[in-house]
Amino acid sequence: MIEIKQLKGQKKYQEVTQLMNKHIQKMSENIKEEEIWFLEHENVFTAGSSTPKEFRIDEINKIPVIKVNRGGKITFHGPGQLVIYPLINLKKRKKNIIDYINSLEDICIKAFERSNIKLHRKKEKNRGLWAEKNNASKKIIFIGLRYSKGI
């Protein structure tokens, strides 16, 4: 069974990453079980693996920029924004990463439908979900994953 955890207060990105890495290591050793973490971060920009190599800025408007080992480009995290970290063993579940991302998007689509908010996908390369507002698509669900050792 997957344990759901809510980390209260605004968390430093680096501290959460350290905790997550320890948990994932223990999962790979079959010491820890799968968990899903819900939290808010202190203001931070993260620069994923698709960020251009020329991008060498340490902060934007006095907000730190941290290079991270997940897919995607630059993403802002901050107070009031819910961040969800599913620590799931895909190898054990016999799921590939594309099916997993599709499942995450499907869950979000169904959850938002309950509040009469219709979300849609764009092309396969551009993962995440969009909502329509004032005749314009606004991306409101961002998915940036790191996949290592089947987790």
Where are these predicted regions, by residue range?
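Conserved phosphate/anionic-ligand binding catalytic regions in large, soluble enzymes, centered on
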Residues: 149-151
